[in-house]
Structures are given as structure tokens and as C-alpha cells.
């Protein structure tokens, strides 16, 4: 008789491009987002939590490829009784949902509408080292104001946010540019062909990777990339490419010099002059608020996303050095970007609604804080009340209740209490600072044993026998003094 086939078991593994987050990481992110929300709230922004799912129609141009709605996003088509239904997708960012929310509820919302949003977004793109298909974003936007004061405020708020979470002044800079200035440069170049203009924009977007010489080559005939492959250029002459390079390299020693260089780059272009005037206005507003060039600067080399924004753009760059995976020094780089996009709601209402906002890369900012030592890499676990007699579980629950009521994180060991060594191993794996022990003898004498697990580990690793005798890591105290002694040990550990 043939043996019945075993039911195949599913593989216990995360899908490609996704990962799990455990205790300390989740706590660190939560605490950082709480600090950021505090800054946003202080600036008068209100929280918004929108659906993780939107219709593909609502996502619209925010998708990388509108002709293939399931490309770049996680999308599916609803089935209806009368046939195929709407295409739905997990949100690609937090901006597209804002456009839909404002268009849908604009009659009930104040104008301008100032909102912040935090949460995961999903992108169906090829994953790589440090690049996941689900990640957190933290956005703040002002919808309904065309004033440059809104842009200046976003820049100031971004600066305050970085300092609040632990990036000191001098270790970051918020850099500001304007898409209109680039439009003026393109106008000066006399590029009428839309395809060629788009090619120039894509080339400029690579400035931070290939530098001035690389952009010059890509604007011309082309260049060899790092792999040796030849990348075709835009095909501009040196004279045509000149204004672009002048624009990218126009930052001077101070704001006045930068502005003068930009005016030379845009010539008589009205749109270019308007963009420069807006930059000057933003600079004046920031200076009035006490935000000097040690925090926020006008920098025409900020070019990422210029094809998307319609006016001012800004980027927060961390300037301190770290070591990459090959041991080479490099700057940490950008952790946030944003800008003005005045066609945000137009696709829903047919009316242009001005808007400006910023998005913080949560995981990158967390990584930066770890590099600066601003976040504990290992979170302290709970105090563990061990179980010496399973029939006395009520007594142990009373102990843990006293600790919790005193504001101390604590738990009773709920595994098999037969092996006391396993209980201490559990406490070690939880990174617990203290273990509480009460066996039959302690119960009879009205005392408890309190073990300082942090000090005990340090003594075991470094102390001599004499030092170990002089510095005991286990204390016997009266049962009534349990909370006071635990609090004392935790305070000493906190230093």
C-alpha cells in the first residue's frame, strides 16, 4: 500500500524585497517619528492617515508607467459581477493620496491645508542591498498657498526637525534651488524640442553622480560608464551646453554671488528671473527667522527631481563622513527632499492648486542617527521576575504588578520554570537589566534576591576574583523594598 503523500509545508521566508522589523528597530522608529511629529505639530500642521490602497486612476501620473498600471506598483484588478472592475494599487508614496484627499474633501478642509503623514509605501521595483519594496516615508505639505513663505517655512521646519532628532548644526545643510531657473536656462539655450528638453533634464539629474565633466560629456556626444559601456549623449554643441553647466556650477561664496551668477546664466528669460526672485525672497524670509547659511543655502546643484517640481526644490544633506562597505570615507548624503508642485490637484478638479512639501526618508535618517551615536543600538529589555515555584504564580504576578505600577517595564517568566538556568538565558536574550528571584527560603524570610544582570555580565567579563567579591551583582533586600531597589539599580545602569 502506497504511503500517503505529505502535505507540502510553506517556506517560512519573507518575500523578495521585504524584511521584518523587530523590537528595538520598531521602538527607535516610533520614537523618532514621535519627535518629528512634535516639530510638525508645533508648526501648526495636522496629522492625516489615508488608505494604503488607492485606485490606479487616482495615482495617475505619479505612477512610473501609466500605460502599464501594474508596473512599478503592486496593483490588481477588482472583479465585479458585470465584468472587470477598477485597478487598485498599494500607495506608491504619500503625495498622491494627499492629492486625492484634498480634491475629495476640499470643501470641508481649511485653505491652506497643512498636513503631515507618516507610514509605509510600496514600490514594485527591483530590490537591492538596502533597497526594499516597502519602506517608511514622513511627509509634510501645505496645499493652497502660492506664497514663497510656505516654501521658506518648509525649509525652516526641516532644519528644526533634523536638529530635534539629533543631527547637530554643522552636520547637515538644507539646500534650495528653483525649477523656474532651470526653465530659464533651457529657454536661453533655445531648445524647442520637448524630447531634447527631457533628455537634458535627465542628464542634469545625474549631476551628483557623474559631476561637471560627466554632465558635459552626456550633454554632448556621450561617455563611457563605470562598466565600460558607452552611454549616448543628448547631442548638444559646446555653446548649447554652456548655460546648463554655468547653472549647475553657479554657487558662490555667499548668497549674493550665487544670485548674480544665476542671473547671468538665465539672461533675459522672464521665467528664469522669476525663479531667482523667488529664491531671493525665500532667503530673506529665512534670514528674518534666524536661519543662516550654516543651516540653509541657495545651491543650484540641487537637481534631483527637477523634472517633477514646478518651483522651489530643497534637499537636506548630511555632511558628516561615514565608511562605506569597502572601508572608504564618504559623506552620508541626502535624507530628505521636496519642493513645489502646483499641479497637484488639477487632474481631479481642473483647477490649479498650489502646493509645496517635503518627504523624509525614515530609514536613512535612522541610519544617520545610529552613525552619530544618537540611538541606542540595543534597547534595554524588561525586568524579569523568575518563577521558582509554579504553584506560587499569583505571588510573582503581584511582584510584577508592583513594578509596572511604579512605571518599570517588567514581566513574569512564562516558559517552563523547571530549569532556572534557562530563565536567566531568557533574560539575557531579552537584554533584561534585572532579574528578581524569590524561592521558598526567600519567601519564608520575607526577602527577595535582585540580580543586576548588566553589572554581572561586566564583572564576569573583566573582573578578578577579588573584584568580584567586592562588587556583588546580586542583592538580598526585604520584600517591601523590591521596587525601590530595582529602581536604584536601573538608575545606576542609566548612569
Swiss-Prot record:
Record localization: Cytoplasm
Q: Which reaction does it catalyse?
A: tRNA(His) + L-histidine + ATP = L-histidyl-tRNA(His) + AMP + diphosphate + H(+)
Q: Which superkingdom does the taxonomy of this entry point to? A: Bacteria
The molecular function GO annotations come to: ATP binding; histidine-tRNA ligase activity
Q: Which UniProt key words apply to this protein? A: Aminoacyl-tRNA synthetase, ATP-binding, Cytoplasm, Ligase, Nucleotide-binding, Protein biosynthesis
Q: List its EC numbers.
A: 6.1.1.21
Coiled-coil regions listed in the entry: none
What sort of enzyme, by top EC class, is this?
Answer: ligase
Matching Pfam families, A to Z? HGTP_anticodon, tRNA-synt_His
Q: Which NCBIfam families match?
A: hisS
PANTHER family in the record: HISTIDINE--TRNA LIGASE (PTHR11476:SF7), HISTIDYL-TRNA SYNTHETASE (PTHR11476)
What does the subunit section of this Swiss-Prot or TrEMBL entry state? Answer: Homodimer.
Family per record: Belongs to the class-II aminoacyl-tRNA synthetase family.
Which protein, by its recorded name, is this?
Answer: Histidine--tRNA ligase
Gene label: hisS
Amino acid at each position: 500500500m502506497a504511503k500517503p503523500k505529505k502535505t507540502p509545508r510553506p517556506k517560512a521566508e519573507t518575500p523578495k524585497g521585504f524584511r521584518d522589523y523587530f523590537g528595538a528597530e520598531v521602538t527607535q522608529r516610533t520614537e523618532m517619528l514621535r519627535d518629528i511629529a512634535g516639530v510638525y505639530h508645533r508648526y501648526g500642521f495636522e496629522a492625516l492617515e489615508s488608505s494604503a490602497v488607492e485606485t490606479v486612476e487616482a495615482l495617475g501620473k505619479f505612477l512610473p508607467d501609466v500605460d502599464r498600471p501594474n508596473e512599478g506598483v503592486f496593483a490588481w484588478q477588482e472583479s465585479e459581477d458585470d465584468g472587470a472592475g477598477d485597478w487598485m494599487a498599494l500607495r506608491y508614496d504619500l503625495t498622491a493620496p494627499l492629492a486625492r484627499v484634498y480634491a475629495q474633501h476640499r470643501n470641508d478642509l481649511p485653505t491652506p491645508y497643512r498636513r503631515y503623514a507618516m507610514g509605509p509605501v510600496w514600490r514594485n521595483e527591483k530590490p537591492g542591498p538596502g533597497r526594499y519594496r516597502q519602506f517608511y516615508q514622513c511627509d509634510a505639505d501645505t496645499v493652497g498657498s502660492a506664497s514663497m513663505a510656505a516654501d521658506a517655512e518648509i525649509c525652516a521646519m526641516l532644519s528644526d526637525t533634523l536638529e530635534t532628532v539629533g543631527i547637530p548644526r554643522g552636520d547637515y545643510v538644507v539646500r534650495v534651488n528653483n525649477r523656474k531657473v532651470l526653465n530659464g536656462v533651457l529657454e536661453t539655450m533655445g531648445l524647442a524640442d520637448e524630447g531634447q528638453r527631457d533628455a537634458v533634464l535627465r542628464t542634469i539629474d545625474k549631476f551628483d553622480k557623474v559631476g561637471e565633466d560627466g554632465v558635459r560629456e552626456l550633454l554632448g556626444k556621450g561617455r563611457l560608464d563605470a562598466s565600460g559601456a558607452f552611454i549616448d549623449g543628448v547631442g548638444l554643441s559646446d555653446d548649447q551646453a554652456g548655460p546648463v553647466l554655468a547653472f549647475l556650477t553657479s554657487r558662490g561664496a555667499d548668497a549674493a554671488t550665487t544670485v548674480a551668477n544665476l542671473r547671468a546664466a538665465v539672461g533675459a528669460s522672464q521665467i528664469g528671473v522669476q525663479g531667482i526672485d523667488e529664491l531671493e525672497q525665500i532667503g530673506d524670509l529665512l534670514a528674518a527667522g534666524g536661519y543662516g547659511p550654516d543651516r540653509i543655502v541657495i545651491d543650484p546643484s540641487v537637481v534631483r527631481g527637477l523634472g517633477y517640481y514646478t518651483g522651489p526644490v530643497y534637499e537636506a544633506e548630511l555632511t558628516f563622513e561615514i565608511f562605506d562597505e569597502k572601508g572608504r570615507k564618504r559623506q552620508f548624503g541626502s535624507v530628505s527632499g521636496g519642493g513645489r508642485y502646483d499641479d497637484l490637484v488639477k487632474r481631479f478638479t481642473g483647477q490649479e492648486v498650489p502646493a509645496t512639501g517635503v518627504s523624509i526618508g525614515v530609514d536613512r535618517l535612522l541610519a544617520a542617527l545610529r552613525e552619530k551615536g544618537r540611538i541606542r543600538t540595543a534597547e534595554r529589555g524588561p525586568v524579569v521576575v523568575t518563577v521558582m515555584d509554579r504553584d506560587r504564580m499569583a505571588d510573582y504576578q503581584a511582584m510584577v504588578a508592583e513594578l509596572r505600577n511604579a512605571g518599570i517595564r517588567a514581566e513574569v517568566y512564562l516558559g517552563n520554570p523547571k530549569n532556572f538556568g534557562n530563565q536567566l538565558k531568557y533574560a539575557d536574550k531579552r537584554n533584561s537589566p534585572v532579574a528578581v528571584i524569590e524561592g521558598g527560603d526567600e519567601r519564608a524570610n520575607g526577602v527577595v534576591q535582585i540580580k543586576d544582570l548588566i553589572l554581572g555580565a561586566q564583572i564576569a567579563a573583566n573582573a578578578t576574583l577579588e573584584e568580584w567579591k567586592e562588587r556583588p551583582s546580586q542583592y538580598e533586600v526585604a520584600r517591601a523594598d523590591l521596587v525601590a531597589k530595582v529602581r536604584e539599580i536601573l538608575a545606576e545602569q542609566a548612569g
